[in-house]
Amino acid sequence: MAAAEPAVPALPGGGGAGAGAPSGTVPVLFCFSVFARPAAVPHGAGYELLIQKFLSLYGDQIDMHRKFVVQLFAEEWGQYVDLPKGFAVSERCKVRLVPLQIQLTTLGNLTPSSTVFFCCDMQERFRPAIKYFGDIISVGQRLLQGARILGIPVIVTEQYPKGLGSTVQEIDLTGVKLVLPKTKFSMVLPEVEAALAEIPGVRSVVLFGVETHVCIQQTALELVGRGIEVHIVADATSSRSMMDRMFALERLARTGIIVTTSEAVLLQLVADKDHPKFKEIQNLIKASAPESGLLSKV
């Protein structure tokens, strides 16, 4: 037998519907995970106010990097249903906040109109420490050239440039949308989110740079949590330790992130020999990416 849904308890101080609630408010049971807490909301409260109340009740337990849906317990059906469009609280009810499941099987389709390139922390001070750094610079430059040819926006970050230096000179930043200093490991900063919001129809991010197990990994996980499909370019990302790099890529692949190569990305973006930019991309990839040993350690 299915467990009964919790009844909406009366708020302290009374017995009838709405008893104990301040005048002009309605008692609502807010359910999240295994918890259920009653609270009063204004009569006519809609989606935004319900979200605010969930955050005030459970803020420290809600992973803000995930997407959620609010559901209403429907007596008619005996179960929760997605909150109806235009819903407004008019009587005591039960609502719950449910995380949307991340789709682990992704097709990985890339189109120039729905893709942004993220170049992460390719800075001078990392040169002596990062394995195969010269090779990932070469591949990163190839990707940025491809982005310019195809009109794909590029966002670049630099980790604490005051101490770690600027992006290496071999990387041509001509035409990039944003170059941003940071101290946070992830590239997902408010300025980056604002820049993404200005680009219509963004579905995919092509991510490369350093370090694979730190800034690349944390950026990828945050983006996936926001519903963006992530492609990590294996021949354009590295770490100081190949073990750290290998296990980071394995972990990321298990979460549905696509681990790919620079040539695969560029050819997927043109998709057809008859694409008007195919010849330029073909010239770009005529020289194969360096056989550095990176791909044998994915």
UniProtKB/Swiss-Prot annotation:
UniProt cross-references to SUPFAM superfamilies, sorted A to Z: Isochorismatase-like hydrolases (SSF52499)
Cellular component per GO, a single term: cytoplasm
UniProt-listed InterPro entries: Isochorismatase-like_dom (IPR000868), Isochorismatase-like_sf (IPR036380), Isochorismatase_domain (IPR050993)
Modified residues (Phosphotyrosine): 160
Keywords from the named record: Phosphoprotein
Any Pfam family the entry gives: Isochorismatase
Residue positions where N6-succinyllysine is found in the record: 279
The organism's place on the tree of life at top rank: Eukaryota
PANTHER family tied to this protein: HYDROLASE, ISOCHORISMATASE DOMAIN-CONTAINING PROTEIN 1
Family from the record: Belongs to the isochorismatase family.
Name of the protein: Isochorismatase domain-containing protein 1
Name of the coding gene: ISOC1
